[in-house]
Structure formats: C-alpha cells, structure tokens
Design a protein with these regions (language model features):
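Electropositive, gly/pro-rich neighborhoods at or near active sites that engage anionic ligands
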Residues: 1-43, 50-54
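Gly/Ser/Thr-rich loops at beta-strand to alpha-helix junctions
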Residues: 22-26, 48-56, 78-79, 119-130
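Conserved acidic residues
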Residues: 42, 117-118
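Long, charge-dense
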Residues: 55-107
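Short Gly/Thr/Asp-enriched flexible loops that form oxyanion-binding sites at enzyme active sites
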Residues: 55-62, 129-138
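Short, acidic/small-residue loops that bind anionic groups at enzyme active sites
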Residues: 69-76, 131, 135-153
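A short, acidic, amphipathic alpha-helical segment used as a generic capping/interface helix at domain edges
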Residues: 101-116, 124-128
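C-terminal functional extensions of proteins
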Residues: 141-171
Length: 171
C-alpha cells in the first residue's frame, strides 16, 4: 500500500525501470545518472569522505559532464575537533592532537540549504552515514561504502567469512 502513495510510487517504479534497463550492463554510477534523469532531478548532492576526495572529484566531473548540477560537501566540513562533540581523547587516532571530526549532520544541512533533489553518499563512516541519511531532506543513495581494509569493498569479507575472515568475524 505504501508503494502506491504519491511520494513513493514514481520513485519505486522508476527504480524498477532503471534496474531492468541496465541490468548487468550499467555500473552503479550510470544507474544513478539514469535514475536521476528519469526522475527529472537536475541538482544532486554529493556527501563524501575526505579519504575519497579523488574519487569524489571523478564522480562530480562525470555528473557535471552528463548535465547535472552538483553540490558537494566533504565530511570534515566545519573543521571542528572531535572533542567538541564529546569524543574522548583515547578514541582519537592520535590522542592529544587536533583531529577534525566528521560532520555528517552539517553535510546534510548544507545540502538541504542548497535544495538538492537527490543526494549521493560516497564513503562516509559507519554511523556517520546513518546520521547523514537521517538529516538529509532529499532521499539518499549510496555509491560507495567505506571499508578501509578491503579497498571499499565490504562484500569481500562476506565472501570469505568462512575462510580468510573466519576468526576475525566469529561472534
């Protein structure tokens, strides 16, 4: 019943149409562009991790070259020390040093202020991505998830859960 609501129906049907059109032929970035075109989205938001700024630049260039307006915002926006958000020193990578915090709520608010129509999440940390989704007014899709060990391919740990990662993943 919820799929028939005005706010969900076109979005869901368009998603199914894009899946069908590009099935096993289009990479996810192409799917995002085709979905956005089909939904008549012109202004896209890109919330990205500082560790993936090169990849974010490529994504932004590809989107712009395909006719989209892109508003991008890096995770460290605001340049606030983690301690300002209550992170204990022992939880910093280098205790006692300035360490800029990720700021997913500010990322969402900045994109909200620019009235983006659809937002793309590129490599935000676990939990930070959730806060970004929660505070984004526009719906969000994920292009890249962060996995510092597996070159941002977390499915690798799933494929090898019974072999290479068996001891690491046992509960």
């Amino acid at each position: 019943e919820r799929y028939w609501s005005e706010e969900n129906h076109d979005f869901f049907v368009t998603s199914a149409a894009i899946e069908s059109a590009g099935y096993c032929r289009w990479p996810r970035l192409k799917e995002i562009m085709e979905f956005s075109r089909s939904m008549h989205y012109q202004k896209l938001g890109l919330a990205f991790c500082a560790a993936l700024k090169k990849e974010a630049a490529v994504v932004e260039r590809v989107l712009r070259n395909n006719g989209f307006q892109v508003v991008s915002v890096i995770c460290k926006t605001g340049g606030l020390d983690k301690s300002r958000a209550g992170v204990p020193e022992e939880c910093k990578l280098q205790p006692g040093q300035f360490e800029a915090m990720c700021n997913p709520i500010a990322q969402a608010e900045l994109l909200n202020s620019q009235d983006t129509q659809f937002n793309i999440c590129l490599g935000l940390c676990v939990g930070h991505d959730s806060l970004f989704y929660q505070y984004s007014k526009a719906l969000v899709t994920t292009l890249v998830v962060k996995d510092r060990v597996l070159a941002h391919n977390p499915v690798g740990a799933i494929h090898y859960a019974d072999t290479y990662f068996k001891d690491l993943l046992k509960g």
